[in-house]
């Protein structure tokens, strides 16, 4: 991932593995595919070389539907077509030669995309649902040690820690990790 502006965790992934070559790295992803999405889109694509290319990023594969151009026949994934991500995050839909879509010249793709701009600082800070005990965002920091056996030594929220509320939440979490440890916070510089 090289879209550091929209997918801020990619900054940490890149720095950890490509610049400093250290591990492990534990990430808390707050981009929720049930909550942070754009409205459904339908577009028609020309079949070229037995495939179509959906030149959009952030497509949720479980919500990708392929139909004939008129939208009257919906084709089956892995039977009539195979969809896969490319290295740049777009999607290629290959038509199965023995599938029902084999003679189509154009296909209609309907899909839902992630919307990173819908993430808020409240999502990053997170919460605890008292009814279900489900934790989100920075509230998950205390789960890292018991679940994985690693003590989070550096806490950061790339693209978010310049927000005062996020900075305070990071400081609070770093001061007592699993009631046993402390960590340090790496803050963004607001430019």
Question: Each predicted region: which residue ranges?
Answer:
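Surface-exposed assembly/interface segments
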Residues: 1-191
């Amino acid at each position: 991932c090289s879209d550091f502006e929209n997918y801020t965790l990619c900054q940490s992934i890149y720095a950890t593995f490509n610049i400093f070559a250290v591990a492990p790295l534990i990430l808390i992803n707050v981009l929720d595919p049930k909550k942070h999405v754009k409205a459904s889109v339908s577009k028609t694509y020309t079949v070229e070389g037995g495939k179509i290319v959906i030149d959009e990023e952030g497509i949720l594969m479980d919500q990708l539907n392929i139909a004939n151009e008129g939208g009257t026949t919906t084709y089956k994934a892995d039977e009539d077509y195979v969809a896969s991500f490319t290295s740049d995050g777009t999607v290629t839909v290959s038509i199965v030669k023995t599938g029902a879509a084999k003679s189509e010249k154009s296909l209609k793709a309907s899909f839902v995309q992630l919307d990173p701009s819908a993430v808020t600082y409240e999502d990053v800070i997170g919460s605890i649902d008292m009814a279900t005990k489900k934790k989100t965002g920075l509230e998950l920091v205390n789960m890292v040690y018991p679940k994985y056996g690693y003590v989070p030594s550096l806490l950061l929220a790339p693209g978010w820690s310049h927000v005062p509320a996020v900075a305070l939440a990071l400081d609070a979490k770093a001061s007592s990790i699993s009631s046993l440890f402390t960590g340090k916070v790496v803050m963004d510089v607001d430019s």
